[in-house]
Amino acid sequence: MRITQGTFSFLPDLTDEQIKKQIDYMISKKLAIGIEYTNDIHPRNSFWEMWGLPLFEVTDPAPVLFEINACRKAKSNFYIKVVGFSSERGIESTIISFIVNRPKHEPGFNLIRQEDKSRSIKYSIQAYETYKPEDQRY
């Protein structure tokens, strides 16, 4: 099951050249660029682990690509995304984010149904991978 999170989630995986163009766009908009990774891909898990510090006032995509590749090498079986953050007053939020690395196998989610009062049913999801210990996922 292909996970769809981020700006280009329904498109094929971005090539390194396409990633470079997106980084150029983020630089032109003066965004702080961060690299994050996780092995818990639940849709409400918005707090991924940071890879190093965010890159502020970058003028060239090379250092960002270097950090992406270092993260890919160290965390090859994790989801890795690039995040562009605007510090502009009134926005102060993530403007763009997209996945640049995925595990080879994406097992998907388990739908959990719970009966509640008055015969109502509550639904939740849990990633199949979270049944395994954190260091054994993917």
Curated annotation (Swiss-Prot):
Keywords: Calvin cycle, Carbon dioxide fixation, Chloroplast, Photorespiration, Photosynthesis, Plastid. GO terms for biological process: reductive pentose-phosphate cycle. One of its GO terms (cellular component) is chloroplast. InterPro entries: RuBisCO_ssu, RuBisCO_ssu_dom, RuBisCO_ssu_sf. It comes from the Eukaryota. It is found in: Plastid, Chloroplast. One of its GO terms (molecular function) is ribulose-bisphosphate carboxylase activity. Belongs to the RuBisCO small chain family. Heterohexadecamer of 8 large and 8 small subunits. RuBisCO catalyzes two reactions: the carboxylation of D-ribulose 1,5-bisphosphate, the primary event in carbon dioxide fixation, as well as the oxidative fragmentation of the pentose substrate in the photorespiration process. Both reactions occur simultaneously and in competition at the same active site. Although the small subunit is not catalytic it is essential for maximal activity. Carbon dioxide and oxygen bind in the same pocket of the enzyme in a similar manner. In this alga, in contrast to plants, the small subunit is encoded in the chloroplast. Although originally identified as Cyanidium caldarium, these sequences derive from Galdieria sulphuraria. This is Ribulose bisphosphate carboxylase small subunit. It comes from Galdieria sulphuraria (Red alga).
